[in-house]
A protein has these predicted regions:
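Long, charged alpha-helical interface segments
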Residues: 36-43, 47-121
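Conserved mixed alpha/beta catalytic, RNA-binding, or beta-rich assembly cores of soluble enzyme
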Residues: 1-49
Length: 121
């Protein structure tokens, strides 16, 4: 299990291509429910993977892909409509969304799940 985001989407993509294994994208969500920003990322990664002979063969992947394709030019606008954005507004930190939606700010993978811990790669 690796941890990816918009911030390192190309590094994540390259790692998955190099592994040449089936991919399952699991979105963290919030309190056992999906959220917009994670689903946008899943759609963006799915979009990238489709260009490398991977398949989007279930409804969740197709819905994430559609959400991303419909909003790829206005990610922040749609993310600011999310429940998570409302939570961030209460703390005065909506700028975090803008940061997290930056594409390829970091050219490497940051973390991997090993057992029950996230470790640096």
């Amino acid at each position: 299990v690796i941890i990816g985001s918009f911030l390192n989407i190309t590094a994540t993509l390259n790692y998955l291509i190099d592994q040449n294994l089936p991919v399952v994208i699991h979105c963290a969500g919030w309190k056992e429910a999906p959220n917009i920003e994670d689903t946008l990322y899943a759609g963006a990664l799915t979009h990238q993977l489709l260009g490398h002979e991977f398949l989007a063969d279930n409804d969740a992947a197709k819905m994430a892909l559609d959400l991303y394709l419909q909003n790829k030019n206005s990610l922040l606008k749609i993310a600011l409509k999310s429940d998570h954005a409302e939570r961030l507004k209460k703390f005065g930190i909506t700028k975090d969304l803008n940061f997290c939606l930056q594409v390829d700010k970091y050219p490497h993978l940051n973390g991997r799940l090993m057992g029950s811990k996230i470790v640096k790669i």
